[in-house]
Amino acid sequence: MKIIGDNLVPFKAFSKVTGIEDIKNTKPNSMIFFDFNEELLKYSFFQHLNFLVYVKSIKEAIYASNFNAKYIICENELAKKLQKIADNYMWDSKILTIIKSSDDLEKVALEEIDGAIYSDLLEIKVWKIF
């Protein structure tokens, strides 16, 4: 299970972007994060970028997977549904559910979700991911 944002687990820096200009201003080979956006998905795919994308629906997740998102981030109820779909279709993208503390890790593991990301990471400009 992947854990992103825990103090005990190292993780590589990533940046939140809202547009293509933001992406162009990131360091080469850096990981980027954005809310689902068709333009950013296409750009990231064709530029062969590593990215995380926040989705709100199964449809958005299907598109994110097809554009090779490294991680698809969503709320827990959606994550449970997406994990079954991802497993069935053998997506390369990993499903991450949003958690508030390490107390939530056992629940995520029992639900067999690929991983978890701490909510506080999604509220600031620069984060770390491994």
Segments (PLM) and residue ranges:
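Conserved N-terminal beta1-alpha1 strand-loop-helix module at the mouth
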Residues: 1-66
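Catalytic cores of alpha/beta
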Residues: 58-67, 100-115
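Solvent-exposed alpha-helices and their adjacent loops that cap or buttress functional pockets
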Residues: 25, 88-89, 109-110
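Glycine-rich beta-to-alpha transition loops that act as phosphate-gripper elements at the mouths
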Residues: 35, 52-58, 76, 95-104, ...
